[in-house]
């Protein structure tokens, strides 16, 4: 099993658009092969910080997700809404890889 934790800080004025766009991406991602879970969480300390927590059956499933058209659309929509780059960690077999 592969876990992904992706943390993003958004611009305050972009928060609503970020959440709306994320809902679309999440819905499409749940249909993907190998997606066990794909959730968005908001920080309780900072309303502009969001964390995606993902679980995938295999690394190949995660790789396919990275090429999905809806993820490409999400990246394009969310890029101008971010206050800083997304921090991504992939966890597998007890190892953590930071991208």
Residue map of PLM features:
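Generic alpha-helical hydrophobic packing signal
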Residues: 3-9, 15, 19, 23, ...
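Short amphipathic alpha-helical segments
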Residues: 14-37, 70-74
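Solvent-exposed, non-membrane alpha-helical residues enriched in polar/charged side chains
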Residues: 7, 23, 27, 63, ...
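Ser/Thr-centric signal marking residues that sit
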Residues: 8, 29, 86
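PAS/GAF/H-NOX family sensory domains and closely associated sensor/linker modules
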Residues: 13-14, 83
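Glycine-rich beta-strand-turn "strand-cap" elements at beta-sheet edges
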Residues: 40-48, 74-99
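Short, well-ordered beta-strand segments in beta-rich or mixed alpha/beta enzyme
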Residues: 2-9, 39-66
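Residue-level signal for well-ordered alpha-helical positions
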Residues: 21, 41, 65-68, 77
């Amino acid at each position: 099993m592969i876990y992904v934790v992706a943390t993003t800080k958004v611009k305050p004025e972009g928060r609503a658009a970020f959440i709306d766009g994320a809902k679309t991406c999440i819905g499409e991602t749940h249909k993907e092969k190998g997606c066990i879970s794909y959730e968005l969480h908001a920080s309780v300390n900072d309303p502009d910080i969001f964390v995606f927590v993902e679980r995938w059956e295999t690394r190949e499933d995660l790789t396919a997700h990275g090429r999905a058209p809806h993820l490409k659309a999400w990246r394009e929509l969310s890029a101008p809404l971010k206050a800083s780059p997304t921090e991504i960690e992939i966890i597998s077999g007890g190892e953590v890889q930071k991208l």
